[in-house]
Every structure is written in C-alpha cells, then in structure tokens.
Amino acid sequence: MSSYQKELEKYRDIDEDEILRTLSPEELEQLDCELQEMDPENMLLPAGLRQRDQTKKSPTGPLDREALLQYLEQQALEVKERDDLVPFTGEKKGKPYIQPKREIPAEEQITLEPELEEALAHATDAEMCDIAAILDMYTLMSNKQYYDALCSGEICNTEGISSVVQPDKYKPVPDEPPNPTNIEEILKRVRSNDKELEEVNLNNIQDIPIPMLSELCEAMKANTYVRSFSLVATRSGDPIANAVADMLRENRSLQSLNIESNFISSTGLMAVLKAVRENATLTELRVDNQRQWPGDAVEMEMATVLEQCPSIVRFGYHFTQQGPRARAAQAMTRNNELRRQQKKR
C-alpha cells in the first residue's frame, strides 16, 4: 500500500454529519460558497445567480432614480468644457483630388454587305436570338436559350432574347409494375426440377413468408437446372441467409446469386461467405446494400473468399476499407484472366 493510500485510510471512518453539526453559521456559509464554485454546472447559470453577494452592508437610504438622473444631468451641465490644446484655424492643406477624364474610344463603323444589312434590318426577335447564339454572344441570353439555339436546326426561341425562360416539360415516367412471379408455382417447379426453369426472380416482393422462402431454398438443394437465383429487396434476414448458405453447400448448378438490399447482418453474410467456399459452380455473387454495415471482419472475409474461389468472376459489394478493396480487385482480375484462358483452350 502506497503512502497516499495510507493517508486516505485516516479519513475513511470520519463522520461527516458530526463535523457539520460542530460548524458555526459563518463556517457553513463559507463552505456553501466553496461548494458552489466547485459545482461543474455552476458555469451554466446566469451571472446574476452565479455570483455570490459582495457585501452585507445595509443601504444608507432609499434609492430615488429620478433624483439621481437629475443630479447627473445637472453635474454634466455645470462642468466647464476644456479648451483644445491646438485650436482649429480652418486652414486647408493639400490639393483636392480631381478624377481625370477618360477618353471614350470612338466606335468603329463596320460596314456589311447590302444583303446582310437588309437581312438584319428585317430580322425578327426570334431570328436575332438564334444569330446571337451562333456568334457566341451568350451574355445576351440565358443558358437554355443559348443551347436550344445551337442544338436545334430550327428557330426554337420564338419569343426573342428578352423572353421569360420556361422550364422543360418532361414526360411522366410511370412506376415499374410489381413483380408478377407466382411464388407457389415457382416453388412447385423448383421441387419438380423443371427443365425450362433456369431463373428464379423474386425481386421486390416484400410479403413473402419466411417459411416459404426457407422451403424454396430447401428445394433448390436438389435442383439441377436453375442458373440464377435473385432475392433483391425481399426483406430477407439472417434466417434466409442461413437457408441460402445451406443451399449453396449442396447445390451444384447455380451460377448467379443476388441477395442485395435486404436486412442481412454480418452473421448472415459470414455464413453465406463460408458456404461459397464449398461451391465450385457459382460465378456471380451480389450482397451489397444491406440495412447495416457488415464490418471490417466481413470485408476481410469477402476478400479471402474471392482469393480462394477462382470460379467467381463477378462480385457486387462496395468496400469501405482500402485493404479489402485492393485484395478483392486483384482477385477478380486474376479470376477473370483464368476464365479467359480456359475459354481459349
């Protein structure tokens, strides 16, 4: 035990209440002032409440504000003004500044051919606007008028240079229609191993029950014809990610897997990445835009999987760290080069 700790042991059994009872009123008031200054929230109070009383003297008389103002005004009038040390004589020194006159250059008289003179004399405002745009006199018009005149083969600024610029009218773009896929029918076809079913697209269907998605992943284990499996924006979470991981361990025909824009956490992504190592047919994997950032460990695992799986040639994820991003880019370049060499053979 150090000397400082031994010194503190003396004050452990002290009765604070007994000490406070023995203090006089003056000592208690002084202690209160010291504690107020030590309070960390004391600086948050206004100055009038933060400062303690500076004096305890009683007032010598009542305060009359009007009498005080009259006294100060009378005293100010009775005080004699001081004379200037250096009296002002009114003498002006120096010369006043006169701005020199600038010579206005004479405008050059430009003579045009009679045909051009006649054409410009009878040109309308719309034609003059297009002529100004062709001559790069863009300061006379707005940007819209300038580019419309250059890009169009006809006179488009029909109201002239001083016209009010109207906004462009864009064609309304309708929303994309909902996904027409019948989930129950797709599930039956996957279970029956339909030869004509090569793509399962359930994108943007957000009301799929979790048990049905789990059954679909279970049926995909034995399917040998489906090449593309997409679950984008289906509100899938970690249970679906674990089902997809189990499917990847047994399926040997799937080539493209897309689970972007879902609610999969780092645990679910880690399970999918571990299952990708055991799959030799998958060539495309997309896992970007999840609800939460997966973390540095998952990004390092992604780079490791791409280095150990030469079959993956397309990977969809936006890395936030420079190290995994560089490793993943190098691995993808190597995998695509290997695929190109295999096609040559």
UniProtKB/Swiss-Prot annotation:
Record's subcellular location: Cytoplasm, Cytoskeleton
SUPFAM superfamilies named among the record's database cross-references: RNI-like (SSF52047)
Entry keyword Cytoplasm: yes
GO biological process terms, semicolon-separated: actin filament organization; muscle contraction; myofibril assembly; pointed-end actin filament capping
GO MF annotations, alphabetized: actin binding; tropomyosin binding
Ranges where the record places region Disordered: 42-63
Similarity comment: Belongs to the tropomodulin family.
UniProt name for this protein: Tropomodulin-4
